[in-house]
């Protein structure tokens, strides 16, 4: 369950035509809907909605507010239901996602009486990128009661620009690759993902791979269904 959620949080663009625009949605009233399907079978695993509710200034940054909801194949809400979250956009257009704080918010929904603490460094996506750019590592550690979950995201690299078509439409995207290692009670995961981001929107597609005898094997794909 935690692994699936973190993939969403990471939940994380073609030709510089919109260079400088942050890689996130900043439009209150807009709702982005995603669907994750299993590789091979095409089985629906979940649906995610990100309902953007507000934008506010905080120092020199812009804080984007949204409500994050995950539903299972049958439509029932998971992870404690709707959860308020934020993304920060710095003055230079860099998008900053504190994955630890996002996970902390969901776990608070699920375990409202448990003491919590979080630490780490956020995942950053600069507004202007080029193939070959290396992005800073991101780390998080969330403690809920006696349980601790850590995540280390390394090897973050800009692969290419690509125009792709998903159910929500056709988008010019930047493609990022990253290596993620998770540690927690009953959960030890080591995966690589490729992620397509569109300026002014955010995630458009997410492919998750695990390694089998040293070879990457596609596990699942998540795409933007409605925008």
Each PLM stretch: what is its role?
Residues 18-90, 101, 137-227:
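Acidic, serine/threonine-rich low-complexity disordered tracts
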Residues 1-4:
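Positively charged n-region of N-terminal signal peptides that target proteins for export
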Residues 8-9, 211:
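A periodicity- and composition-biased signal for non-globular, repetitive helical segments
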